From Swiss-Prot:
InterPro entries: GAF, GAF-like_dom_sf, HD/PDEase_dom, PDEase, PDEase_catalytic_dom, PDEase_catalytic_dom_sf, PDEase_CS
Pfam families the UniProt entry points to: GAF (PF01590), PDEase_I (PF00233)
Domain PDEase: 558-882
Positions annotated to bind 3',5'-cyclic GMP: S411, D426, I445, Y468, T479
Protein name (Swiss-Prot/TrEMBL): cGMP-dependent 3',5'-cyclic phosphodiesterase
Biased composition (Polar residues): 177-188
Record's GO cellular component terms: cytoplasm; cytosol; endoplasmic reticulum; Golgi apparatus; mitochondrial inner membrane; mitochondrial matrix; mitochondrial outer membrane; nucleus
Cofactor(s) this protein requires: Zn(2+); Mg(2+)
Gene designation: PDE2A
Source species of the chain: Bos taurus
Region (Disordered): 1-21, 177-198
Main EC class the enzyme belongs to: hydrolase
Function: cGMP-activated cyclic nucleotide phosphodiesterase with a dual-specificity for the second messengers cAMP and cGMP, which are key regulators of many important physiological processes. Has a higher efficiency with cGMP compared to cAMP. Plays a role in cell growth and migration.
Amino acid sequence: MRRQPAASRDLFAQEPVPPGSGDGALQDALLSLGSVIDVAGLQQAVKEALSAVLPKVETVYTYLLDGESRLVCEEPPHELPQEGKVREAVISRKRLGCNGLGPSDLPGKPLARLVAPLAPDTQVLVIPLVDKEAGAVAAVILVHCGQLSDNEEWSLQAVEKHTLVALKRVQALQQRESSVAPEATQNPPEEAAGDQKGGVAYTNQDRKILQLCGELYDLDASSLQLKVLQYLQQETQASRCCLLLVSEDNLQLSCKVIGDKVLEEEISFPLTTGRLGQVVEDKKSIQLKDLTSEDMQQLQSMLGCEVQAMLCVPVISRATDQVVALACAFNKLGGDLFTDQDEHVIQHCFHYTSTVLTSTLAFQKEQKLKCECQALLQVAKNLFTHLDDVSVLLQEIITEARNLSNAEICSVFLLDQNELVAKVFDGGVVEDESYEIRIPADQGIAGHVATTGQILNIPDAYAHPLFYRGVDDSTGFRTRNILCFPIKNENQEVIGVAELVNKINGPWFSKFDEDLATAFSIYCGISIAHSLLYKKVNEAQYRSHLANEMMMYHMKVSDDEYTKLLHDGIQPVAAIDSNFASFTYTPRSLPEDDTSMAILSMLQDMNFINNYKIDCPTLARFCLMVKKGYRDPPYHNWMHAFSVSHFCYLLYKNLELTNYLEDMEIFALFISCMCHDLDHRGTNNSFQVASKSVLAALYSSEGSVMERHHFAQAIAILNTHGCNIFDHFSRKDYQRMLDLMRDIILATDLAHHLRIFKDLQKMAEVGYDRTNKQHHSLLLCLLMTSCDLSDQTKGWKTTRKIAELIYKEFFSQGDLEKAMGNRPMEMMDREKAYIPELQISFMEHIAMPIYKLLQDLFPKAAELYERVASNREHWTKVSHKFTIRGLPSNNSLDFLDEEYEVPDLDGARAPINGCCSLDAE
């Protein structure tokens, strides 16, 4: 067995222990493999290495290819079995463990001790060593040993890799011996220092390469590069050398080691331009004179010194025949230029070391992937601890994505119907919806990724047609490169998009970053889906809590109640009041006990009961249940709901709505009017959010907190036994009715009205088109709002007296806000509110524009607008009077006493039972 000189072995013993090896056993094993130069030495080294790193090793057989392409073991001489588990491992080219080999698999006595079954704590490992360059199994090792731990598994992988490298080295030396021996015998060169034991002479360069190869046992690519570069510097007399590694996509060069120094951060630069890129394509060496100025600038920046001479030689993989690195030597000592001999030295070096280099780099890449997988598992742990809050989860996703990819900025968009919405940024979570970023789901880079579901890696953002640089121009930020990837749920549907901007330690995001982003996106999708599911579960609990709260507050409708209501049948509308269908009628004049019958009368007069075959007892129970569903705040009570419903009836009777809307739409509008303020607590949306109420927890993320609660309560009543008036509807009609009710009730939020006001104006200008579905939706919203504010269309006495009720409600909320330590709005503060000015402002900016639109669409509604304008004049006179005399006292409601009443300009005298519709939700 031939080994390297003792001096070399002493050098090896000083090398640091590879990370993860635990002790010197693995290092000694790799040293043994790194120093062999013949077959006998290889077999002995393999046996010693496996015995050192594996438990309870009893037998090791190493099978190598002979001249007839058979796998043969020399000690004792026998051929590898061709059947059973051995054949299975060779065909699959993967290591296989078993509890012994079958008797029919074993050719004679040498392998008899491996026959199954073995002792329970032992096994036979069949280890095929695959030469990827040749595409075939180069050797097979049979080992009888104990069961492996994780550390022993790791050590075995290292031994396998270095055994294959040692085998290739031995084979290369054998080929060289066969070609060099005759020539060396006849004409021994002067520099040859022959080892005549085998009849072969080696040059000094051969011996140096052999010594270098023996030293290349490192599992760390940087340590390996240091040894190779030191050898090149010595042999070429270069002041420093480096190895520029080519990325898998041939678009990027990276350097980690320069001369005798390992850089703290890897340096990367693009390979798309300049002569260095040509070297990768042409596989031909170049010198300094061939470089472009851009190449020179990049190299000098990397080296930190002036380049006076350079030799760049491509390193070609024998497995793929592709350039995997560029070996560069700089500034030859003595100021000379590099020669052809220097180029030959570099090529000769990598002829023997390129396989070790590429395999070590591949091994290190696997280790890096292992570390990244561990990092991803930690990321998953971090993400799954924030499932209770989607916003916090998205913030965590942004942080982890930025850290994993070394990106400067990260943004996450969630897909919301046809829009991509971002409300979580690097700086934190945006609470105000007005500051959210919303972009169409089919526009821009994020939109493209959301639409295609494919990752998009953009090296140069400004050169990409989908990039909009207006934001950069306005902010001064410079977007260099972008990596945008989709986030999908378990059904592979895109639910969001993540966008990474500006790679920090590289020219752009690499293929490795793409793979990492793809893996990361899986965790994102799972965590977001589970977070949304968690949110739904919480919402279900909140709904359950609210339902229980409502059932405790309200009593169910008894059979006696609806039987009494229907005892004499449904009363005709004309029997209620001769002016019941007139805009001048004040519904609050009707006693509250008679309002349920009035609802039934209006439904019958509009023919909905007959058209939709509604069961009268069910309808009676529904009406009584809705009435009980209202609490008793000063304004948002059942009488308000009845007044709103009555105004809907007036619109139907006076404006001929059947020429504009479908019957189902009108029916949905009327029922929505009845239910639009169910379970109102006398406080608005802002108060719910500020007080962190159960309602806010349930609905604040969607907006319109109270309106969504009103609709939910309406559904709860419909789902109550004996109250579903839509029970006979088809599935399609039932779904449409609920959709209409939801949209109409949500339209009672004045914020919604203000959002669609321009669309309403445009519709009034161009004229209503019954064939236009959007016009139907807009008109329903306008009609609902006009019904909700209908108290403003009644006489001055009604409007004046009603203001007392609504401001009592407002001031009660203001008192609660003060008790919470908050500052209420002026209109809610009994000590600051100047009611005449507040009413004038409300009528000018909200009420009058609404009824003006109604007049434009329905000329018969002109009297409504005129009456609202008249009431506005009354408030102006009241305001002027108090400007002269001052407020009567500190109580802002005192001015409503009869002493300060202004005579009714239109002479209308209406019974007082209600309030103005300043709905501040």
